[in-house]
Amino acid sequence: QRQMCIRDSPFAIGWTPYTLKCMLVGLLLYGCGIALYYSSRENRRPGEEYGSAKWGSPKELNRKYMDHQHKDANIILTQRVRLGMDGYITQRNMNVLVVGGSGSGKTRFFCKPNIYSANCSYLITDPKGELLRAAGALLAAQGYEVRVFNLIDPSQSDGYNPFSYIHSEKDVLTLIDNLIKNTTPRNASSNDPFWERGEIALDSALMLYLVSEAPSEEQNFETLIYMMNFADVKEEDEQYRSPLDMLFRALEEEQPNHVAVKQYAIFKQAAGKTAKSIVVTAAVRLATFNIPQYAEITRKDEMDFGSLGEKKKAIFCLIPVDDSSMNYLVGMLYTQCFQALYRRADAKYNGRLPVPVRVIQDEWANVAQPESYPKILATCRSYNIGLNIIVQNVQQIKALYEKEHESIIGNCDTLLFLGGGNEPTSLEFIVKLLGRETLATRTRGLTKGRNGSSTTNYQQTGRDLMTIDEVRKLDTHKAILFIRGEDPVIDRKYNLKRHPNIKLTLDGKAKPYIHKPQGAPDYALPDLPYAFKSLDDYEFIDMEEPEHELSEKEKDFKPDKTE
């Protein structure tokens, strides 16, 4: 009968007096088994005991990160690897760090291919003007607006006036701070901050005066240093009033709370000898703008940095390779360009520019970068901006940003190593970045003699994916590519001759591009307003006259505002 019940209802569950006891015993045995398993289990990663580094596949990397729908909208990295420019799709920023020794092809294998693609707006540092000559005609044919800031031959330069990007008192202080930092030698010993603050007070007073009181054509560094030439200081006579003092006194009578008046008052608190030292220091720092050719290219502005993110536009900054004394002007340009792009994006486009902007900084270490460069690297992705840092070795980054060099490297999701250098720091850096792999080794032992024997041992050991010696001897035609979160790959450098737009460039036998500036400035420095309108006509008091007579003349002085 029991067998018939089981046959008719094989899944029927019956309850007996032993059911509960059996369940408890079963649970107890199950718990003991789990405890025994975890107590005896070891932390094992077979084949990865000494490291899990391995080489990736260029084909797989390209399949994952290339923008296949818009094949022209990619960053060219190696012969077989592209990176899409839409960060929301790739989840990687457009910041690329390119490291390669002299002759490794940083310009040929990275800069030129990406400029020839003509798929975004560009801000380019161009030593020797090589990139402009090679790519200018192509960009012009593609409908680009090409602008050039030429420190090699200023007569062929478009205008860049830093005053055109001053929109508030804060911008004035930022510009002065950038000017001072970019014209101070990198390894200069720190001076008393008093002198620097005094110089800032004087410079800011003059800039704020020009921005608020002078016509737009007079708002430039040439006018500023012209004004500074009249900041006479008599060490032996604290009561002496220079023409510049008279100018600010006239402004104070009209607008006592003017910020320029307040800044000038800070400067005037310095004693005669101290004030003279401040004036001399400030004048020497601005001496560049006494040179006619540099004064001319900074009189008016033709760059319009904000439009880089709105239309196809390329700005080339040409710097001489044998003289870096004027490169601080490019540093100022970069600072104001980033400010203008961020401001335009926030004001008009909800924080993201419609046209991608790539900043290709060849010879990055030769141009003073903005003080906030690490922050710009960290935030530019959301604004649709990508920074491409091109250096000969990692030590150049450490020299400029000793405390923040790791942050700069870390904010570049892509690193391209082109080889061609013997600098130990860079070689060690690449070796550590590649990591270590686990290898299976076999050792054999042989004992000869009457009772000879042989043994074979199998074991695992760790090894760098590439040693320093192997990195140093990397094939000239190959590069090592790192993309954040991916295995490194070795691939051939890009073949420039296979670029689809090569025929329109100098490398494709086209004629070199010769830039024609927008036109020579038609502005000649007029006299300044207020006291400067008739400065040469003033009859200044001889310092040997009695002190009470000097004070009387000062008291009666009124600037002629009707001229």
Q: Where do the model's predicted regions map?
A:
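P-loop NTPase motor domains
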Residues: 92-385, 400-403, 410, 461, ...
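Membrane-interface segments at the starts/ends of alpha-helical transmembrane spans
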Residues: 7-23
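Canonical hydrophobic alpha-helical transmembrane segment
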Residues: 19-34
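Glycine-centered structural positions embedded in regular secondary structure
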Residues: 1, 73-78, 176, 180
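Juxtamembrane/interface segments at transmembrane-helix termini
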Residues: 33-54
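Short, small-residue-biased leader/transition segments that mark boundaries at the very start
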Residues: 2-6
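N-terminal pre-Walker A segment at the start of P-loop NTPase domains
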Residues: 58-87
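Conserved ATP-driven motor cores of ASCE-family P-loop NTPases powering translocation/secretion/packaging/pilus
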Residues: 377-480
